[in-house]
Amino acid sequence: PAKEVVDWDMYLGPAAWRPFNPRLLDGFNFEKGGGMMGAFGAGGCLEWGSHCVDLCQWANDADGTAPVEYEPKDGQLHARYTNGVKLVMRNDGWLPLGSCPVRFEGDKGWVETGDDGELVASSPELLVNKGAKIGGYPADFHVRDFLDCVKTRAQPRANADAACYSHIACHAANISLLLGRKVVYDPVKHEFPGDEEANRLRSEALREPWRM
């Protein structure tokens, strides 16, 4: 939209004041929009990474926690949970199995899948009696799951903790990438113990008169 029809002050919200920039209005276009700007979004690590990390959290039975160590290595981000499980975030090297790919590696090999539901393994034996396609997880499944949980009082698959901590993991990963070094995170206190430089990046100063 044209500058004349944009309430720029309201659009900026609590972010620091800056001159009108039409590129920042395309916040959900991560190729050219404001989603890559720290004041308006956390870039691809949060936008795409959270969709993959939540599956890794689920597989590790870690919906209510997050990795405790994060370190950039060779263009990737390596993280570690308290139980020793490692999480690696990377931009490339995936099989063409749809968006949001995940690979699970163990002492017997690896299994990889994506949004299209196809399973590919390092060894055919890993898929014996499991099938080669598990099907996607359509959005209406989440609706049905939520409504069922309203009745049963169980936790839905996509519960609040799953969303919260997968995003926390991605934010901590971003901080490690920004600093270019290893950081240690406490998922209970939600802080980087003894690391003021990392702790300062957990939030930004709010522009007056905004409060949170």
Feature annotation, model-predicted:
Residues 1-161, 165-212:
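Contiguous beta-strand/loop segments that form the cofactor/metal-binding neighborhood of enzyme cores
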